[in-house]
Amino acid sequence: MLDHSDEIHPLFHGAPKTTEFRKLRKRLVRQTRDAIERYGMIEKDARWLVCLSGGKDSYTLLAVLYELKWRGLLPVELLACNLDQGQPGFPATVLPEFLKKMEVPHRVEYQDTYSIVMDKVPQGRTLCALCSRLRRGHLYRIAREEGCSAVVLGHHRDDILETFFMNLFHGGRLATMPPKLVNEEGDLFVYRPLAHVSEADCDRFSTAMGYPIIPCDLCGSQDGLQRQQVKAILEGWEKNSPGRRQVMFKALMNTRPSHLLDTALFDFAGLARK
């Protein structure tokens, strides 16, 4: 690991010199690299649109990708992107100033999706679905305009687990957000390189680095969201049985269609005795 500030990317200037932080940084790099390689995210001459919301997860994503690129382990071009959605009180200057200071190529765009969401969604209903759909549409458009082949998101292991249980409890299906997919139009990849990284590690890293975290008041102000309920359940399981989250995550990589009930995945009718 490089220790001198003139030998590392500006995103890591001022990094703690503690053994604990070095282990955390090494773990983040290893887990992210493993996910990138495992799910085949690297294309020749690729350009990635790295989405930056200002939350702890997206800061971690940006820093770790630049760490990999700095080491010569990520041969792609990176363009950071923040979509200012017009939320009241959003500190519009924080991210542009941060990215300029960190010498990170970026694009910041203002689109007032907040007003659309508040106008279209009945009072008391969850805002997240429409907000996410509008944001995704703009990010895809920006990626095309910038000549990017992939939109890169900061979802981590815990997001993936929570989505799995939301689909299980409320959607009646076994599914979650995949680490890699192709959009409906078929012209862009969507990557989640932090798929193997825990939320706790993202929090520890961004806090230790002192990045200017921007809270999502639009989502966080809503009580009783399904995701928050599932998060509380998972936290309870983890407290009673430490390591439970990682065991469940491993299960998502170790499915056995023959031991489930989906006839689209396994031909039960075609089973024959010898």
UniProtKB/Swiss-Prot annotation:
<keyword id="KW-0820">tRNA-binding</keyword>
<comment type="function">
    <text>Catalyzes the ATP-dependent 2-thiolation of cytidine in position 32 of tRNA, to form 2-thiocytidine (s(2)C32). The sulfur atoms are provided by the cysteine/cysteine desulfurase (IscS) system.</text>
</comment>
<dbReference type="GO" id="GO:0000287">
    <property type="term" value="F:magnesium ion binding"/>
</dbReference>
<dbReference type="GO" id="GO:0005524">
    <property type="term" value="F:ATP binding"/>
</dbReference>
<keyword id="KW-0547">Nucleotide-binding</keyword>
<protein>
    <recommendedName>
        <fullName>tRNA-cytidine(32) 2-sulfurtransferase</fullName>
        <ecNumber>2.8.1.-</ecNumber>
    </recommendedName>
</protein>
<keyword id="KW-0808">Transferase</keyword>
<dbReference type="GO" id="GO:0016783">
    <property type="term" value="F:sulfurtransferase activity"/>
</dbReference>
<dbReference type="InterPro" id="IPR012089">
    <property type="entry name" value="tRNA_Cyd_32_2_STrfase"/>
</dbReference>
<keyword id="KW-0963">Cytoplasm</keyword>
<comment type="subunit">
    <text>Homodimer.</text>
</comment>
<dbReference type="Pfam" id="PF01171">
    <property type="entry name" value="ATP_bind_3"/>
</dbReference>
<dbReference type="GO" id="GO:0005737">
    <property type="term" value="C:cytoplasm"/>
</dbReference>
<comment type="similarity">
    <text>Belongs to the TtcA family.</text>
</comment>
<dbReference type="GO" id="GO:0034227">
    <property type="term" value="P:tRNA thio-modification"/>
</dbReference>
<dbReference type="InterPro" id="IPR014729">
    <property type="entry name" value="Rossmann-like_a/b/a_fold"/>
</dbReference>
<feature type="binding site">
    <location>
        <position position="131"/>
    </location>
    <ligand>
        <name>[4Fe-4S] cluster</name>
    </ligand>
</feature>
<dbReference type="GO" id="GO:0000049">
    <property type="term" value="F:tRNA binding"/>
</dbReference>
<keyword id="KW-0067">ATP-binding</keyword>
<feature type="binding site">
    <location>
        <position position="128"/>
    </location>
    <ligand>
        <name>[4Fe-4S] cluster</name>
    </ligand>
</feature>
<keyword id="KW-0479">Metal-binding</keyword>
<comment type="pathway">
    <text>tRNA modification.</text>
</comment>
<keyword id="KW-0460">Magnesium</keyword>
<keyword id="KW-0408">Iron</keyword>
<keyword id="KW-0004">4Fe-4S</keyword>
<feature type="short sequence motif" description="PP-loop motif">
    <location>
        <begin position="53"/>
        <end position="58"/>
    </location>
</feature>
<feature type="binding site">
    <location>
        <position position="219"/>
    </location>
    <ligand>
        <name>[4Fe-4S] cluster</name>
    </ligand>
</feature>
<keyword id="KW-0819">tRNA processing</keyword>
<dbReference type="GO" id="GO:0051539">
    <property type="term" value="F:4 iron, 4 sulfur cluster binding"/>
</dbReference>
<keyword id="KW-0411">Iron-sulfur</keyword>
<dbReference type="InterPro" id="IPR011063">
    <property type="entry name" value="TilS/TtcA_N"/>
</dbReference>
<keyword id="KW-0694">RNA-binding</keyword>
<dbReference type="InterPro" id="IPR035107">
    <property type="entry name" value="tRNA_thiolation_TtcA_Ctu1"/>
</dbReference>
